Amino acid sequence: MVRIQEVRKCGEEICMMRNILCIILCMILLSACSSKSNEIIEGYSNCEEYYSDGFQDYIDYCKYFYKESEDKIFEENSYYSIVTKENIDDIKSYFDKFPYESMEDSNKYDFETDNINEGDYYSLRAGSNNDNYSVFLYDVNSHILYYIHYNI
């Protein structure tokens, strides 16, 4: 009789531990899904986000509005580099080939490559075939972080 109670108690402890681990795993998964990219720096006052969801093919366009006092954050952030005359054409090429017409809200796409200037800040993540890329461009004149993502 004592032995049966010990087995039952052990089974209940295992079940409780399994439930706790399941809850922890769910919390981790949910927090990972809702977290933004490291390149989207906290402190923006407003944002406009346009996503075209697909199973594997999707296009994103977002704008994050900052105050002028936030400019220094981009300068000090390790994810960002400064736009120079040597890399400006490469950065512009990603925006030029960005297929915004495929977006559900294509009329919301208002980015002009003339907005890219030396002294702005950018971060670029690109796949090997140019079929997957993310570009983050912080325009120091307008204090807007532009984000485009293309995955086909």
Task: Indicate where each model-derived feature is located.
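Intrinsically disordered, low-complexity segments enriched in small/polar residues
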Residues: 1, 9-10, 41, 52, ...
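Sec-dependent bacterial lipoprotein signal peptides
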Residues: 1-31
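Intrinsically disordered, low-complexity regions of eukaryotic proteins
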Residues: 8, 14-15, 59-62, 141
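Intrinsic disorder/low-structure terminal segments
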Residues: 13, 24, 64, 73, ...
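Short alpha-helical segments and helix-capping/turn motifs at coil-helix boundaries
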Residues: 15, 47-48, 131-132
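Generic hydrophobic/packing signal
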Residues: 27, 32-34, 39, 118-120
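N-terminal export/targeting and maturation segments
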Residues: 33-92
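Extracytoplasmic electrostatic interaction patches
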Residues: 88-152
